[in-house]
């Protein structure tokens, strides 16, 4: 349903904008103020956020967005969660279901824009890699189907919002921690910066250079 999809994606984008705006509040904290209670966090880290991993899995990501993500074979986003825990089971279940991206491909296909059969039948538990044949279909869609194009652009809007969140997160951590190791043991700013240019819907970005 085109109109329902647009309404839901618009709401999701607005929620993402609200999340990004919260960083303004966190940035009122000075490095010394954060350091005064950082030890109490122990190894707690946003890296451990099952909800964020579940969000990424629902969208279509199957590996961490950071450096080396493309080297994996999928199903790795839940490895840091306690085996058998409700949080891990939720993330693993999301990674085993058709994602928003998979649903978008089927939506376009049903709208009369035939997607490659391999793209429609790919193993949803594995990471998606951008495909030129899919991008060719998306290019034709943008030129000939304004309504479907609006849905695709709404997906780009949300993906861009996720990128804004990542960027603001990186800069907040950099101004608060500098180059220190992250609370959860990651490389800190280095790890976060590596997540910046890994969109969830790569085909919708790559096709633009071919229009």
Predicted regions and their residues:
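Surface-exposed peri-terminal alpha-helical interaction modules
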Residues: 1-211
């Amino acid at each position: 349903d085109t109109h329902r999809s647009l309404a839901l994606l618009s709401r999701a984008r607005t929620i993402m904008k609200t999340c990004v705006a919260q960083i303004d509040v966190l940035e009122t904290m000075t490095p010394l103020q954060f350091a005064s209670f950082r030890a109490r966090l122990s190894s707690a880290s946003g890296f451990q956020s099952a909800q964020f991993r579940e969000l990424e899995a629902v969208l279509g990501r199957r590996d961490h967005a950071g450096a080396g993500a493309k080297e994996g074979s999928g199903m790795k986003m839940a490895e840091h969660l306690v085996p058998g825990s409700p949080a891990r089971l939720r993330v693993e279940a999301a990674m085993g279901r058709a994602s928003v991206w998979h649903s978008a491909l089927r939506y376009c296909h049903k709208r009369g824009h035939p997607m490659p059969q391999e793209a429609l039948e790919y193993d949803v538990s594995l990471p998606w890699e951008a495909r030129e044949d899919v991008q060719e279909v998306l290019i034709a869609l943008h030129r000939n189907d304004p309504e479907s194009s609006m849905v695709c652009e709404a997906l780009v809007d949300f993906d861009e919002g996720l990128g804004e969140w990542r960027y603001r997160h990186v800069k907040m951590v950099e101004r608060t921690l500098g180059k220190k190791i992250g609370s959860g043991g990651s490389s800190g700013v280095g790890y976060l910066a590596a997540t910046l240019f890994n969109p969830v819907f790569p085909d919708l970005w790559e096709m633009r250079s071919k229009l």
